[in-house]
Amino acid sequence: MPTILERIMLAKQKELEIQKSAVPIATIEDQIRDMEIPLNFSGALFGDRIRLIAEVKKASPSKGLLMAEFDPVDLSKTYVDNGAAAISVLTDSRFQGHPSHLKSVKTITSSTRIPVLRKDFIFDPYQIYETRILGADAMLLIVSVLSQKQLIGLMELARALWIQVLVEVHNEEELKQALDAGAEIIGINNRDLQTFETNLSTTERLSPLIPENKVIVSESGIHNRKDIQRIMKAGAHAALIGEALTSAHDV
């Protein structure tokens, strides 16, 4: 039986073929020429305290609906007003996300100079051009769903389009792949994408293996101040938090 991740990737491939037919890549390339240079995502994550990447997320494959009354603009405004260093937007349909959510969020963040990360399952160059036209300042690449050749190629294209890349890893082997590919921002996912179980010890185990000149982001399984202190002690510069915020009664 296919894993959750395998089912997601199969569905994404089908969706992408439809999208490519509807909007040819040449059309997107023409629109990119007149766009402004994206904001500095990695620069927003440095400081004397741990930084928050707050996630705009309606649902998750593991827990289902997180917010019944979901407004990406209102939610991102709340995040910005409360000191988020960056905003992450889920654009994948499995999270009840949509690319339009990111464009909507940019209407709030552009004036405040807060960068926006596109979080999706990206594996094709077309998706990077799409990411740029949506206005994202950074995007996620997940090592476990890419070959090393794919990872390097997608990172090079993103760099050419001025998009910074958060490269997500879950174990030592994936971390080596990310570093070998030249990743500057490493996302340590505390969630195992095969089982969807979380454990903060993943950040504690992998963080010491990352060179000091890299930006470390701890992702998933972060619910309270104690968790923040734990990952900060491990060496994380930023925490990406979604479910704990979107499922809270008072964000």
Residue locations for each model-derived region?
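Glycine-enriched alpha-helix->loop->beta-strand junction motifs that scaffold or abut catalytic
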Residues: 83-84, 108-112, 133-139, 159-163, ...
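Alpha-helix-loop-beta-strand connector modules within alpha/beta enzyme cores
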Residues: 36-43, 47-48, 96-121, 143-144, ...
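An N-cap/entry alpha-helix motif that binds or orients negatively charged groups
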Residues: 2-67
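Glycine-rich phosphate-binding active-site loops on the catalytic face of alpha/beta enzymes
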Residues: 133-150, 188-196, 234-251
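Active-site mouth loops of central-metabolism enzymes
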Residues: 53-71, 114-123, 164-169, 217-222
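Catalytic-face loop-and-helix region of soluble metabolic enzyme cores
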Residues: 185-241
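Catalytic cores of alpha/beta
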Residues: 123-135, 170-182, 218-241
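Glycine/Thr-rich beta-alpha phosphate-binding loop at enzyme active sites
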Residues: 58-69, 78-97, 179-207
